[in-house]
A protein has these predicted regions:
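C-terminal juxtamembrane segment of a hydrophobic transmembrane alpha-helix
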Residues: 18-20, 24-46, 66
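Extracytoplasmic low-complexity repetitive segments enriched in small/polar residues
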Residues: 33, 57, 71-74, 80, ...
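Intrinsically disordered, low-complexity coil segments
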Residues: 10, 78-85, 188, 196
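Membrane-proximal N-terminal amphipathic helix
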Residues: 43-73
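Extracellular/periplasmic head regions of type IV pilus-like filament subunits
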Residues: 71-161, 169-172
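N-terminal leader/signal peptides at the extreme start of proteins
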Residues: 1-17
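Short, surface-exposed interaction loops/tails
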Residues: 140-213
C-alpha cells in the first residue's frame, strides 16, 4: 500500500525523469531547427544583398569611366566591343593597342576591385562570368531607350531572389531593373522576353544599369 501511495505521489509531482529528458530533447531539436532555418535565411539575404551591391558597383564604375573618358567602355575600344571586353575595359585589362586614340590612358585604372579580371574578361567571386552590353529594355517594362545591361552568370536562385528584392523591392524575375532566368538575359541589341524562373539551381542575372541613350 505504501509503495502504491509513493507511486501516486511521484506521479502527481510532475513528469518522470524519462519524460523530462524526452521533453528537453524535443525542445533542443526544435531550437536547433529554428536556428538553422533563420541562419540560412540570413545567409541567403546577406549574399543576395552583396550581389546587389556588386551590380551597383559596376554601374558606378561605368559612370566613373564615362566621367574620365567622356565615352562608355564599349565606345573606347578600337576593335569590336564584346560583353567580355567591355568588362575588361572597366578593369583596365585591355591591351594597350585595344584603346581608341581618344582614350586618355593616363586616367585608366581598375574601376572594379574585388572582381577577378584578365584580358579575357571578368568573373564574379563565385566564378561566374560577368559581361555587359548595350540593349533596349522595353521587354522588361522599363520603356524605350538604350542601357548598359550587366549580366552575372551562374548565380544561385536564392541570391537572385534576394538581390531582386534589394533592387526592385520585390521578387519579380520578369520585370524591373533586375531580372533573371535560366538562359542568357541579354541579346545582340535588345533584352529578350524573360521566361519564368526555375524552381532551383542557378540563373543568369541581368541588371539594367546606365542609360546611354
Amino acid at each position: 500500500m505504501m509503495s502504491f501511495l509513493k507511486g501516486r505521489l511521484a506521479g502527481n509531482k510532475g513528469y518522470t525523469i524519462d519524460q523530462t529528458i524526452l521533453i528537453v530533447a524535443i525542445i533542443a531539436i526544435l531550437i536547433t531547427l529554428i536556428i538553422i532555418t533563420v541562419g540560412w535565411q540570413l545567409i541567403t539575404r546577406s549574399t543576395g544583398t552583396k550581389l546587389a551591391a556588386q551590380l551597383r558597383q559596376i554601374e558606378d564604375a561605368n559612370g566613373q569611366f564615362y566621367s574620365q573618358q567622356h565615352m562608355w567602355p564599349y565606345q573606347a575600344q578600337s576593335g569590336t566591343a564584346t560583353g567580355s571586353s567591355n568588362m575588361a575595359a572597366l578593369a583596365n585589362q585591355l591591351a594597350s593597342g585595344s584603346w581608341t586614340n581618344a582614350v586618355d590612358t593616363s586616367q585608366l585604372s581598375n574601376l572594379i576591385p574585388g572582381f577577378t579580371s584578365s584580358a579575357a574578361g571578368v568573373t564574379q567571386p563565385n566564378g561566374g562570368a560577368v559581361t555587359e552590353v548595350v540593349n533596349t529594355v522595353d521587354s522588361v517594362g522599363l520603356g524605350s531607350g538604350k542601357f548598359i545591361v550587366v549580366q552575372f552568370a551562374d548565380v544561385s536562385l536564392g541570391d537572385a531572389e534576394e538581390a531582386d528584392k534589394a533592387i526592385d523591392g520585390e521578387d519579380d524575375n520578369k520585370t524591373g531593373r533586375l531580372v533573371y532566368q535560366a538562359n542568357a538575359c541579354t541579346g545582340a541589341t535588345a533584352m529578350p522576353t524573360i521566361s519564368a524562373a526555375p524552381s532551383n539551381g542557378t540563373v543568369n542575372v541581368c541588371y539594367v544599369a546606365n542609360a546611354v541613350q
